Amino acid sequence: MRCLIVCENLEMLNLSLAKTYKDYFKIGAAVTAKDLEGVHRDILLKHFNSLTPENAMKFENIHPEEQRYNFEEVARIKEFAIKNDMKLRGHTFVWHNQTPGWVFLDKNGEEASKELVIERLREHIKTLCERYKDVVYAWDVVNEAVEDKTEKLLRESNWRKIIGDDYIKIAFEIAREYAGDAKLFYNDYNNEMPYKLEKTYKVLKELLERGTPIDGIGIQAHWNIWDKNLVSNLKKAIEVYASLGLEIHITELDISVFEFEDKRTDLFEPTPEMLELQAKVYEDVFAVFREYKDVITSVTLWGISDRHTWKDNFPVKGRKDWPLLFDVNGKPKEALYRILRF
C-alpha cells in the first residue's frame, strides 16, 4: 500500500494545478517580485496562471505621495505574467488599511473635503486601470468594508468618514469608467461565517439594487484546520452570493494549522496530525469549489510556499505557520496531492 501511495505521488509530481483545473477556474498565487526567481518561480510557472501582487498594488506602496507613484515592483510582476501567459488580479483600490494619510488631508494639513478625496480616488483608479488594463482581469475595488466587531453594517474608516456611506458605490462607479473588460469585486474575510454573511448580503443587495456595478465577491478564505463547520458555511455562502447574480473568487486562500485564538509558540514544524488535517481541509474545500464551478471562476492562494506567509508572526508574534501547498523548501505537501487527485 505504501508503495502504491508513493508511486502515485511521484506520478502527480508531473501534474500542474493550473492544467488540472483548466476546465474549472483560474489558479492563482499572491506574489512579490522576489517570488519571480528561484524555486518560487519554478512553482509559479508549473502550477499557476493568475497572479495577485501581494502588497505592491496597495495604495501606500504604489502611490505613497500625491505626485509620486511607485510602479517598479508591479512592472516586474506584470512583465513576468505577460511573458508566461498569465493574468493579474488587481488588489486593491479602497481599504481602511495601508492608505497613506495624504489622501485624506488638504494642502493645509486639515481634513480634506469629500470632493477632494473623491477626485484623488478617481485619479488613482484611472491611473492604475489604464496602466494595467492589458493584463488585469479582475479588480478588488473595495476591501473589508463590512463591520464584524459590532452590530453596525459598515466599518468606520477615513473613506466612510469623509465621503459617507456612498463611498463604496462611488468607488465602483469610478472603477467601471476605467476598468474596461475587467470584473469588479468586493473582497472581504470571514464572509462565509453566518454573522458576517448576513451583513455582507444586506450591504451588497442594497448596493446592487441601487445600480452599483459590482460583478463579484471575493471570499478571502483565511481558514484553519480546526473549523468543523467550514464546508457547510462555505456552501451556504456561495449559494447566498450566487443568488445575487454575483461571480465568486476565492481570493486569499491559506489554511493555518492554528486556531486564531491559539497562542502556542512551541512548534518549530507542523505535526503529522496537523499536516493530515490540513490536507483533508484542502481536499474538502476544493471539492466544494469544483461543485460550484459555474459561479467560482478563480481560486488564489495567498502565497506560494510556507517559506513566506503573512501568517508568520500573525496573530502571534514570533510564531511560524505552515498554511500553504508547498513546504519551506518548496516541496509539495500532502495537501497538494489531495487537490490534484479527484
UniProtKB/Swiss-Prot annotation:
The keyword GTP-binding does not apply. Optimum pH is 5.5-6.0. Residues 11-342 form the GH10 domain. Pathway: Glycan degradation; xylan degradation. Belongs to the glycosyl hydrolase 10 (cellulase F) family. Cytoplasmic xylanase subfamily. SUPFAM superfamilies: (Trans)glycosidases (SSF51445). GO terms for biological process: xylan catabolic process. It comes from Caldicellulosiruptor saccharolyticus. It is found in: Cytoplasm. The active site is at E144 (proton donor), E252 (nucleophile). GO terms for cellular component: cytoplasm. Optimum temperature is 70 degrees Celsius. GO terms for molecular function: endo-1,4-beta-xylanase activity. It catalyses: Endohydrolysis of (1->4)-beta-D-xylosidic linkages in xylans. Keywords: Carbohydrate metabolism, Cytoplasm, Glycosidase, Hydrolase, Polysaccharide degradation, Xylan degradation. This is Endo-1,4-beta-xylanase A. Its EC number is 3.2.1.8. PANTHER family: ENDO-1,4-BETA-XYLANASE A (PTHR31490:SF90), GLYCOSYL HYDROLASE (PTHR31490).
